[in-house]
Regions:
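N-terminal pre-domain/capping segments
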Residues: 1-92
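Short beta-strands and strand-loop turn motifs
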Residues: 10-11, 66, 94-97, 131-136, ...
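A short acidic, helix-capping loop that chelates divalent metal ions and anchors anionic groups
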Residues: 13-17, 101-106, 139-142
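CE4/NodB-like, metal-dependent polysaccharide N-deacetylase domain
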Residues: 34, 83-95, 112, 116-128
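Acidic/histidine-rich catalytic cores of soluble enzymes
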Residues: 40, 124-164
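Conserved beta-strand edge residues that scaffold enzyme active sites
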Residues: 46-47, 71, 99-100, 137-139
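Alpha-helix-loop-beta-strand connector modules within alpha/beta enzyme cores
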Residues: 53-70, 117-124, 151-159
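Surface-exposed, active-site-proximal loop segments in enzymatic domains
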Residues: 76-79, 84, 97-111
Length: 164
């Protein structure tokens, strides 16, 4: 007998359906579950409390796997972000995007960015969560020394503090 592999959906793709009202969030999550999904990767709290998000996901039967959180938001109030997503039951916080000034095509900005990224990752790891990076094409450019920006990023930051 084969075992069913759980399937999750990235809620970012449904963002236009999510308003800052509990009714829409619950309705969308019910529809996600009805489509056969087992879990979700959140992309913000949509103006809702973490307690309400957890309540809806528990009621509907969806596992909160991870959450995309903008790096700028993490830099502003990481403690609250960690606390909120831990209340929901999220294990993985994902940085979904790298601002242009920090990309490998801007070596000075990229080198400034790496210690900040490591600091955020360490704090997330110390809180018992895992920090992930959602890549795009702009990390895959060669630096002046011939190394790929993506490789430099992951070689510069301990694996406990950042995972691909």
């Amino acid at each position: 007998m084969s075992k069913k592999l759980p399937v999750g959906i990235q809620v970012y793709g449904l963002r236009d359906l999510l308003e800052n009202t509990p009714e829409n969030f619950k309705n969308v999550m019910e529809q996600v579950k009805a489509l056969g999904y087992d879990g979700v990767e959140l992309a913000g709290l949509y103006g809702l409390t973490p307690e309400y998000v957890k309540e809806v996901l528990d009621e509907v039967g969806l596992v909160p796997i991870s959450a995309h959180v903008a790096f700028a938001e993490m830099m502003e109030d990481l403690d609250t972000i960690i606390a909120d997503y831990k209340k929901i039951g999220v294990q993985y916080l994902v940085m979904p995007y790298m601002a242009e000034e920090y990309r490998p095509v801007n070596p000075e900005g990229f080198q400034k960015f790496l210690p900040m990224l490591n600091e955020v990752g360490k704090k997330i790891h110390d809180a018992g969560m895992t920090f992930l990076y959602h890549n795009h094409d702009f990390e895959f450019v060669k630096m002046e020394d011939g190394q790929w920006g993506y490789d430099v990023m992951f070689a510069s930051i301990p694996h406990d503090n950042l995972m691909p």
